[in-house]
Regions:
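Conserved catalytic core of the tyrosine transesterase superfamily
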Residues: 1-326
Length: 326
């Protein structure tokens, strides 16, 4: 960290301090790459805002500047949830700067977050989910490797409620096909063991036997049949893309979005919709809330409780549809 011109004695450049903070989050807190990117994006925005006000050092991080930054986001039309995340990122930074002596006190401790409006997550109903899976089974019946992989991906997402980042991070050795469990590394590098069902087991077995070897072999030099193909760049990855690399988050997003377009509804049509669907269907079926919390890897029970609201809304909808006095 280097001293900044024009600031108080001992002040350091804000951009350098942010770099050090991000390094701390990566090396010591073990945050996921997705979380690290979010912090860096948020705090780079803060640094740019401070620079637009003529400030480039950490001594400028007063409560007024931080509030002005959040207000500028509100005026720009950012969602309340985004403003709340910006506030949390700024508070984490100022707390760390105070602990490391770069700030005399934590100036962000009184920074308030707007309460994000409660938005019920998108859920696919059981009939639609069955139709979606049936269409994938039919497509996989032709034996095309990508179709077999896609079926295994969707079956596992729905069966386990994994985050998409957790799914693409799986290695072959993380899956126990005898015990029907998968070992997952979630947020904060926390490990948990998540169960899945027989349909997902069958889809994964088919993928491993019939599709993954073909994906590993794909791309070997066609003009030299005797040439040994180079090993895949992610040899341990459970799910491979068409170029023998680990299947990426964007590829899974595209897959799920293309499937959910057949079932229009409120909310984003991404992999998280399958996570929401898995949680809601579990609660609809009588699963214990704390068991669902453990399955999803939520640190707080309050995060899981939103799915009880989804179940209640679905009950109200069924009541209004079916009861003559509704």
């Amino acid at each position: 960290v280097t001293a900044g011109a024009g600031g108080e004695a001992g002040a350091v450049r804000l951009d350098a301090a942010i770099d050090d903070f991000v390094l701390y989050l990566t090396a010591e807190r073990g945050f996921s790459p997705h979380t690290i990117r979010a912090y860096r994006t948020d705090l780079s925005g803060l640094a740019s805002f401070a620079e637009s006000r003529g400030h480039t050092t950490t001594d400028a991080l007063g409560l007024d500047l931080l509030r002005d930054w959040l207000w500028s986001g509100t005026q720009a039309g950012l969602a309340r949830s985004t403003i709340a995340r910006h506030s949390a990122s700024a508070r984490s930074l100022t707390a760390w700067l105070a602990r490391t002596g770069a700030l005399p006190v934590d100036r962000g401790v009184r920074l308030r977050s707007p309460k994000p409006g409660r938005t019920l997550p998108r859920v696919i109903n059981r009939t639609q989910m069955q139709e979606l899976l049936d269409s994938l089974v039919l497509r996989a019946g032709h034996g095309e490797p990508a179709a077999l992989r896609d079926l295994a991906v969707i079956e596992l997402l729905y069966a386990s409620g994994l985050r998409v980042s957790e799914l693409v991070g799986l290695d072959v050795g993380d899956v126990d096909l005898d015990r029907l469990t998968v070992r997952v590394t979630g947020k904060g590098s926390k490990e948990r063991v998540v169960p899945f069902g027989v349909p997902a087991q069958g889809a994964i077995v088919d993928y491993l036997r019939r599709a993954r070897p073909a994906l590993v072999a794909a791309g070997s030099p066609a003009d030299d049949p005797g040439h040994e193909p180079a090993p895949p760049s992610a040899p341990t990855a459970l799910f491979l893309g068409t170029r023998r690399t680990r299947l990426g988050v964007r590829a899974v997003y595209r897959l799920v979005a293309s499937l959910l377009v057949e079932f229009p509804g409120a909310g984003p049509a991404g992999p998280h919709a399958l996570r929401h669907t898995a949680a809601t269907h579990l609660l609809d079926g009588g699963a214990d809330l704390r068991a669902v919390q453990e399955l999803l890897g939520h640190a707080s029970l309050g995060t899981t409780q939103i799915y009880t609201h989804v179940s209640a809304e679905r009950l109200k909808q069924s009541y209004r549809t079916a009861h003559p006095r509704a």
